[in-house]
């Protein structure tokens, strides 16, 4: 059965506390989806944000973003008093998040709540810690150590900690026991609220599509705790990093800077690191969108230290062997493959063999340079249709900034009119396609423009801030 849904980041939900949370406004959004006949809510990664505020560059692939914890829910549980947070000025506007203010003010409030939680832990607290022992203790220690080192990257820590020498880790766990307990308690609060929100959505017949970045940030507990799974030298610096080559959209390419996986090492244990990661994501979401799927067929490797993506080389990825290992352990997880960008036959062949639906972005369909595959009359059933993703302009922004000939092509193709509204006409275009699922950005439903764009790739500042 064909279905539709809306892309709305949790961070963008309305809230009086500076950023969207998993509280009343999230449940009201679920109610709206249900009443509107929608079947899916797509979100961006829910992991903690760090430098640059991008959810795709996180300290942890498993942890939840503390900013999303709803303060009113904590107050209802007796973990906070209204006077402890209602007065705070989050220094934001109704349309923009101020991440600096959140960083300065949110954690003090959460520490108060966690002190009360830990003074009398709920019955399921120890069980939560036990079930998540494959990542939570390392994460809590990592965050405690980052705080102790003024936020410095783990590569700048003392050699024994950087190299995870057992005696150094044991001593750190004693020294920072209180902080470690705080970071574990924060994750308990996050996942308790997340599972309640997901259950509420599922009860309303709304399924949640989560987002899984292919790569891990260098300054993350994931790299620090599993250096053997990444391409690092003896000093634990990357030998090469991830990105995209120069093309018609960027003369110097995209330098992401993430460390690359050591696929040969991962293959030796049946890709256990990835199996754990996918298992966790499948328990967190109903459907998982994997970002940059083409990187599993072949990935672009840039020498560490380069200032641009020029000078990189294509290298062979794990291919189907990775997904065979995942399917052997997990069955058939519901996965959407983000197969955008520079595609070659090996990528297309891998997608066909996996059987996952790929993505079609309507805005790409009218690019005079190369758009034919993205026009909706040709969308296969096994695909997910978008007008645009978080990396694209809302329709009204696209109409104002795209090349005039591209806009004219869209107007002719879809018979767009101002009377209908160009944004409604573009949404109509994907809803009328054969794709099994169509997703529209909340910004397009609201008729917003460039001011509401979520992210502009390869730029710093002003991204990830839009609020409804």
Positions of predicted regions on the chain:
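N-terminal regions that are enriched for targeting/export leaders
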Residues: 1-11, 27
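Acidic, mature catalytic/reactive cores of soluble proteins
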Residues: 2, 162, 202-204
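Active-site-adjacent substrate/metal-binding segments within catalytic domains
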Residues: 6-8, 21, 43, 101
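Alpha-amylase-like alpha-glycosidases and glucanotransferases acting on alpha-linked glucans and related
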Residues: 9, 15, 53-191, 216-439, ...
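Catalytic domains of carbohydrate-active enzymes, especially glycoside hydrolases
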Residues: 24-49, 280-285, 430
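Surface-exposed amphipathic alpha-helices with a cationic face
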Residues: 34, 194-202, 327, 351-352
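Outer-envelope exported proteins of Gram-negative bacteria
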Residues: 44, 207-209, 213, 287, ...
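Conserved, well-ordered alpha-helix/loop/beta-strand core segments that scaffold catalytic motifs
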Residues: 183-216
């Amino acid at each position: 059965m064909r279905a539709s849904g809306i892309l709305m980041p949790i961070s963008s939900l309305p809230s009086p506390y500076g950023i969207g949370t998993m509280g009343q406004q999230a449940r009201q959004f679920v109610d709206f989806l249900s009443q509107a006949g929608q079947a899916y809510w797509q979100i961006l990664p829910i992991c903690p944000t760090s430098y640059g505020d991008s959810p795709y560059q996180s300290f942890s692939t498993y942890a939840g973003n503390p900013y999303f914890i709803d303060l009113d829910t904590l107050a209802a549980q007796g973990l906070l008093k209204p006077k402890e947070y209602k007065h705070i000025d989050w220094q934001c506007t109704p349309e923009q998040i101020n991440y600096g203010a959140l960083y300065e003010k949110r954690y003090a409030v959460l520490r108060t709540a966690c002190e009360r939680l830990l003074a009398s832990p709920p019955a399921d607290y120890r069980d939560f810690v036990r079930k998540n022992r494959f990542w939570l203790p390392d994460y809590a220690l990592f965050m405690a150590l980052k705080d102790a080192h003024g936020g410095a990257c783990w590569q700048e820590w003392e050699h024994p900690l950087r190299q995870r020498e057992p005696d150094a880790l044991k001593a750190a766990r004693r020294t920072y026991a209180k902080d470690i307990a705080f970071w574990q308690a924060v994750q308990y609060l996050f996942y308790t609220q997340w599972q309640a929100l997901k259950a509420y959505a599922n009860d309303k017949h709304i399924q949640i599509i989560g987002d899984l970045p292919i790569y891990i940030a260098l300054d993350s507990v994931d790299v620090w705790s599993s250096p053997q799974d990444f391409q690092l030298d003896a000093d634990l610096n990357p030998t090469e990093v991830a990105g995209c080559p120069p093309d018609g959209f960027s003369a110097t390419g995209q330098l992401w800077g993430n460390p690359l996986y050591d696929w040969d090492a991962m293959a030796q244990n049946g890709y256990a690191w990835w199996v754990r990661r996918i298992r966790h994501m499948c328990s967190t979401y109903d459907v998982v969108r994997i970002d940059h799927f083409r990187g599993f067929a072949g990935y672009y490797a840039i020498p560490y230290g380069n200032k641009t993506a020029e000078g990189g080389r294509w290298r062979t990825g794990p291919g189907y062997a990775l997904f065979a290992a995942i399917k052997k352990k997990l069955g058939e997880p519901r996965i959407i493959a983000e197969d955008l960008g520079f595609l070659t036959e090996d990528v297309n062949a891998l997608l066909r063999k996996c059987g996952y639906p790929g993505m079609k972005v309507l805005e790409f369909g009218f690019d005079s340079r190369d758009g034919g595959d993205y026009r909706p009359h040709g969308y296969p059933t096994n695909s997910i249709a978008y007008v645009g993703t978080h990396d694209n302009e809302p329709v009204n922004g696209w109409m104002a900034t795209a090349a005039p000939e591209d806009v004219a092509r869209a107007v002719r193709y879809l018979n767009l009119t101002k009377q209908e509204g160009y944004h409604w006409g573009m949404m109509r275009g994907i809803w009328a396609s054969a794709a099994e699922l169509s997703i529209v950005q909340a910004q397009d439903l609201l008729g917003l423009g460039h001011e509401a764009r979520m992210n502009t790739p390869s730029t710093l500042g002003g991204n990830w801030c839009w609020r409804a």
